[in-house]
Amino acid sequence: MPQGWSSRAPVDGDVDELIALVSTAKKAVDGSGSIEEELVTSEAVGEASWTRRQVVVMDPQGAIRVWARVHDRAAGRSNVDLTTDPALGAEVEDRLAPSVLAWAESIALRVSRGRGLGGTRLDMSVHEDDERLRGLLRDNGFTLARTWLQMRRPVEPGDVDLPTTHAREGVVVRQVNRREDGTPFAADLQAVYRMIEESFADHFNSYRESFPEFLLRLREAPGHRWDHWWIADIEVEGHWVPGGAVAAAVLPEDASGVPGTYIDYIGVHRLARGRGVAKSLLHAVIADTARRGRNRVALEVDDDSPTGADGIYASMGWVTRYRTESWHRDVRVEGTDDPVPLARLDE
């Protein structure tokens, strides 16, 4: 690093500065400094920090100018997040980037060794307008792997009737069953997990994830709510069985002061495809969003989805607001033949 610069793990007293840094960096890319402050706090010092290793880089005056995180996303996959102060300038940033990315690689490999693995895939998400980060990754051995559509659908009060007006025979959508205190029953949680795991088996960049890993990761989100998880039961030879599921969360208020709903996952089992399960689940989420007085439902979809999901979303009123990109770099631990799990589509 440049002379006088230093690094350390973030502490509670850094949260406000990190929120400001993330907001400034986002504004420099898309013109909006609106961020989820609770998410920044959780990743830095809260529950989401449990599955992340991170470092802040400070200039000679002690100001945080870079925040890097390595998320142990799954066996064989390490998500890397890099937030830099746009005011750094290209010369300083070009000097810092190799050091920070080398740190991320070393941490990811250390975590992999802890899992008994011989390596991992570094995965970084880049906004389509972030040419600065794209250039840094390209110069440090990363390659563009995929493009994702970030879509949003406005919600109107009349949408509460969608599940009734668009009901599909042989498909019933319900929220996961919960006890009086709101805690969900294990059978339904396992059904949601199974539907999502099995439905994403033929999707890009989908890694095997254990049931506890799945639950912990989704519960980390500040907007997590058990009453935002749905199951679509389908009738098969006179019996009702799960055919699909949705895991959603609360979106923070937008510029108009109204919250929304975000669909983290929607999965339809391969044997249930073609029966209107996906649309039935989407109608349930839209109707629930309308009943709660919210104004939008957002989601992410693969630009090259094997199921043509983007076409379904577009036909139901979703529009693409912007795109993000996945940049990858595969790294291995030297001197070991231990396995490196692949994405299921690559197995």
Give the ranges of each region predicted by the language model:
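Flexible, substrate/cofactor-facing loop regions flanked by secondary structure
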Residues: D161-T261
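Active-site/acyl-donor-binding loops of N-acyltransferases
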Residues: S125-V160, H228, H283-E347
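Short amphipathic alpha-helix that is part of the acyltransferase structural core
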Residues: M1-V40, T164-E209, D338-E347
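Acyl-donor-binding surface of acyltransferase catalytic domains
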Residues: D72-N79, T83-R178, E325-R329
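Conserved acetyl-CoA-binding loop-helix of GNAT-fold acetyltransferases
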Residues: V92-R110, Y265-V268, G274-R291, R296, ...
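Extended hydrophobic-aromatic, low-complexity segments
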Residues: P86, H203-F204, W226, W230, ...
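Conserved donor-binding loop and adjoining core beta-sheet/short helix segment
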Residues: V22-G116, V126, P242-P259
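Active-site proximal loops enriched in glycine and acidic residues that flank catalytic Cys/His/Asp
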Residues: I234, V246-P252, Y265-R270, V277, ...
